[in-house]
Each structure stands twice: as C-alpha cells, then as structure tokens.
From Swiss-Prot:
CDD domains the UniProt entry points to: RRF
Subcellular location: Cytoplasm
Name of the protein described by the UniProt record: Ribosome-recycling factor
GO biological process: translational termination
One Pfam family named in its UniProt record: RRF
Signal peptide: none
UniProt record similarity statement: Belongs to the RRF family.
Region (Disordered): 138-157
Biological source species: Desulfitobacterium hafniense (strain DSM 10664 / DCB-2)
Function, as annotated: Responsible for the release of ribosomes from messenger RNA at the termination of protein biosynthesis. May increase the efficiency of translation by recycling ribosomes from one round of translation to another.
Keywords of the record: Cytoplasm, Protein biosynthesis
Length: 185
C-alpha cells in the first residue's frame, strides 16, 4: 500500500518535470528550434491542426527555420497562423517553403522571457508540492485505517519529502539552464 503511494507520487512528479521541459521547448531563446511552432495551429479542412502535422520543419541555420508544407495550398494559412502567434516572427515565402528568420533577442525581451521561465518553474514546484501533500494525505489515511503503522507512515512521509526535494532541485537545474540559454548573447 505504502509503496503504491510512493510510486504514484514519483510518477506524478516525473510528469510535472516532463511537462516543464515541454513548456521550455516552446520558448524562443534566440536560436531556431522546431518546437517553437508546437503551439501554432492552422485551420485545415475545418480542423485546428498543429503546423508540425502539416509540414516538414527543419533548421538549416542556427537562426532560421524552414517550413515545407506537404500540401502547398496550406502555405498561406500557415503563414497567417505564424503572424497571429505571439512569437513575433515574420514569415517569408517563395511559394513552396516558408522561411522564418529568428531575430536576436533584445535585452528587454530576454528579461521578459526569463520572467516567464521563472514563473513556469514556480508553477512546476507548486505542482510537485501539491503531489507531496496528496501523498501525505493518502499516507495519513492508511494510518487512520490501521493499514500501516505510525512508523511506516512517518518513514514514507520522509521518503516523499526527499523525493520532493529531489524534483524541486531538478526543476531549479532545468530553469537555470534555460535562463543561461536565454541570457546568452
């Protein structure tokens, strides 16, 4: 019973950290990354479809993305979706390929992005702590139901705390790496 609670807590904490990594992958850090376009969707045959499901996205140069739609008729729609997005990119097209030149980030924009990065990290820390609280509540319930002894529950709560500390440290490490990447000129 206790092992199930610990395993579930760890699985949920791993998912929280993975979600943060996915979030960070979509944040523009001054260099081209195909994941930047993950949140951009295009109205395609009546359905909102992610750009990466409509085209090949490649990085020919460190600060350029090329988008080559499989269906040429979707090219103008993809261009419009990129212009409407909050990425601040201007697509240029030659009729078959869209090129996105990633401009250098201004110091002001870098600071804004770092604030976003810190906020997302804090949200992840809160999620991990909420998982800890849920696990501790579940452990107390086991003790109350006389399924586990007080000592076992105390040990398990210590394990949950160590797990929480480990994942918060991992979140801080990921945040620090992303922050460095953004502040790099």
């Amino acid at each position: 019973m206790i092992n199930d609670v610990l395993k579930e807590a760890e699985d949920r904490m791993v998912k929280a950290v993975e979600a943060l990594k996915r979030e960070y992958a979509t944040i523009r850090a001054g260099r081209a990354n195909p994941n930047m376009l993950d949140k951009i969707t295009v109205e395609y045959y009546g359905t909102q479809t992610p750009v990466n499901q409509l085209a090949n996205i490649s990085v020919p140069e460190p600060r350029m993305l090329t988008i080559q739609p499989w269906d040429k008729s979707s090219l103008p729609m993809i261009e419009k979706a990129i212009l409407k997005s909050d990425l601040g990119l201007n697509p240029s097209s030659d009729g078959t390929v869209i090129r996105l030149l990633i401009p250098q980030l201004t110091a002001e924009r870098r600071t804004e992005i770092v604030k976003t990065v810190k906020k997302k990290a804090e949200d992840s820390r809160v999620a991990v702590r909420n998982i800890r609280r849920d696990s501790n509540d579940e452990l107390k319930k086991l003790e109350k139901d006389h399924t586990a002894s007080e000592d076992e529950v105390k040990r398990a709560q210590d394990d949950v705390q160590k797990m929480t500390d480990k994942f918060v440290k991992e979140i801080d490490r990921i945040m620090g790496t992303k922050e460095k990447e953004i502040m790099e000129v």
